[in-house]
Amino acid sequence: MASIKATEISSLIKQQIDQFETTVNVQDVGTVIRVGDGIAFAHGLDNVMAGELLEFSTGVMGMAQNLEEDSVGIIILGPYTDIREGDEVKRTGRIMEVPVGSELLGRVVNPLGQPLDGLGPVHTSKTRPIESPAPGVMARKSVHEPLQTGIKSIDSMIPIGRGQRELIIGDRQTGKTAIAIDTIINQKDQDMICVYVAIGQKESTVSGVVETLRQRGALEYTIVVSASASDPAPLLFLAPYTGVSMAEEFMYNGKHVLVIYDDLSKQAAAYREMSLLLRRPPGREAFPGDVFYLHSRLLERAAKLNDDLGGGSITALPFIETQAGDVSAYIPTNVISITDGQVFLQSDLFHSGVRPAVNPGISVSRVGGSAQIKAMKKVAGTLRLDLAAYRELEAFAQFGSDLDAATQARLNRGERTVELLKQDLHQPLPVEKQVAIIYALTKGYLDDVPVADCRRFESELFTYLESNNNELLEHIRTTGNLPEESDLKAAIEAFKKGFVASNE
């Protein structure tokens, strides 16, 4: 029998000791001390980071918000009814991230990136943090490319550029969501990706929007992020950040994205609810002191990047719901000061049949003018002033009928302008057709057409141009410039000769 030498034994033991590895899995664990209404307070998470993801024993995730001396305030990102006092909550060491990438196109997801459309899981290979710094001054480029909404009153008087933030503001039931849907439909073949964020909407409403987009072939380039009215406040608060994080992935890859937040009033209300439950001190209208920062850090992430970074862009259309047209309330004034202009929708106009109910008097686009195509700039230059003058004269005209010829002509032109700026639901108009009809209007070709026939004149003119002078429309579409004025004039005059008014 072979004997083992003492030296060999010691070297074997030494070898085993050297090879021995132990991994200590240290977990920072806390205990829930209070829970309710989507908020939990936990004790014992001493090293937790602000905004860190935490996991409850039920498997539901939470996010650390209040870091206090003896407890941590946590917003619960999911069903909270199964969480009890005394439950364990542990750190994950990660901050909140959402899945991003082209795999999300055509899908409906919740603010955590989980699918809601019943089409199976979303297989994405990348994630992005929901909070990320906005591009700096040197990373940006001035807005210079147009974003065509397909809505005549907006594209002509309140133009929007790629990389702009344009607020859509108005009372409930004034057609805000309709503008969003029409704008998304109009991005077909425009090399644009759309993200529609529904915050606190009824699930039936979101379902209707998704169905409309599907029927129009617009869902294939759209991501829908939905936090419905039945979801807890923390999910409503997160939804816009999820939407913009998904958009940023495309922007940093040189693509153009349109993000619609419908609407930020509900996000602010959800944030107020969350903050009050977290015992944060209330300010004006019971909103917390940082409600401005809530929206500014979101909307600053919309940008037009410079060419070195790929030249991508995020255009943001935030919605705000006003109460009885009061734009001087807290949240509306905050968002007006953050954005690059606003489109104001008025319920009076809406109910009088002017739809979309855009009030050009107090609507403005601060940077869109430099993005408007030359043809539109040329034909619609005076449209806004003409309309403002008409509204002023309209008030005077009610007092007396003995008006001089020039005033009467202005009133007639104004009536036809208002009529022509009306548009049917989900019928966005290509920019070349908008230019053609606004040219006909501003050059006086509709002055002797009865107001009731203006819309028919418009549709028949488009049919005529498409079949007889399509090269004129093609020229506007491809170059952005007005064709030879004599050609456009001749085409409209030739059409007008054959146009029969209904009273003739």
UniProtKB/Swiss-Prot annotation:
Pfam family, one: ATP-synt_ab_C
Residues annotated as site: Required for activity: S363
List of residues binding ATP: G170, D171, R172, Q173, T174, G175, K176, T177
Keyword Transport among record annotations: yes
CDD domains to which the protein is assigned, alphabetical: ATP-synt_F1_alpha_C, ATP-synt_F1_alpha_N, F1-ATPase_alpha_CD
Subcellular location: Cell membrane
GO molecular function: ADP binding; ATP binding; proton-transporting ATP synthase activity, rotational mechanism
Transmembrane segments: none
EC number(s) reported in the record: 7.1.2.2
Highest taxon above the source species: Bacteria
Coiled-coil regions listed in the entry: none
Keywords assigned by UniProt, alphabetized: ATP synthesis, ATP-binding, Cell membrane, CF(1), Hydrogen ion transport, Ion transport, Membrane, Nucleotide-binding, Translocase, Transport
PROSITE patterns the record matches: ATPASE_ALPHA_BETA
PANTHER family registered for this protein in UniProt: ATP SYNTHASE SUBUNIT ALPHA, MITOCHONDRIAL
Protein name in UniProt: ATP synthase subunit alpha
